[in-house]
C-alpha cells in the first residue's frame, strides 16, 4: 500500500522526480521533495497540497552529506517516520572522451555516484534501526549498454547497478529488510539533455529523444508499482523505455 508512506524524492524539481511526487501524492503518500531549485519545489509542493496531498520541500544538493542528512531529519520531524527514498538526481553531460570535458566528468561522479552514496548513508541508520525501508534509484540504459560519448555517464550508471544489487544482497544477509530497486530508463523527455555542454553530442541526443522520447510519468508509474508491492516482495530491476526505441 502506498497510502501514508513517507517518501523522499531527490531531483524532484522537474522531470521524473516531479512526476513521481505528484503521482505518489495522489495515491496518498506523504512526499518529501529535494532539489537545488527551491522555487520549483515550493510551487510543486503547493500544487500537491492544493490538490489534497501532503508534501514537504527541502533544499538539497545531493553532493553534500549534510543536505542529505537534513532532508531525512526534516522528513522524520514532519511526518514521524520514513519509508522510502527515490534517488533520482542525476546529470548526463555526454561527450567523446577526446573532447576532454573533465569538469563534466567530475560533476557526473559527484552527482551520479557520490549523490547516491550520500543519500544511502543518510537513510541507512533509520532503515536499519526500524528493519524496513525501500531505496529506489534512477540509473539508465547506459548502465546496461555502452555507447560512444557515454563513457563517464555510463560508468556512473554501471556503478549504480552494482551498488544497488550489493545493497539488496547485504540487507537480505543481515535481515534488515531494506529493499533496493534500480530503474533503467531509456529515452524519457526530461531536462537531462540540457546538461550536455558538447554541442554535437547534444544535437545527436536531442534527435534521438525527439524521435523516441516518452513522458516522465511512465517512470513515475514504475515507482508507484514498486512501492505498491507487498513488503515481502521485490522487483530489483526495471528497464523502461519507448516501445519503438531499438536500444
Where are these regions (language model features)?
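Substrate-binding pocket helix/loop in short-chain dehydrogenase/reductase
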Residues: 96-97, 104-107
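Residue(s) in the substrate-gating loop at a strand-loop-helix junction
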Residues: 140
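Active-site helix of classical SDR
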Residues: 120, 156
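The beta1-alpha1 cofactor-binding region of Rossmann-like NAD(H)/NADP(H)-dependent oxidoreductases
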Residues: 38-39, 59-70, 102
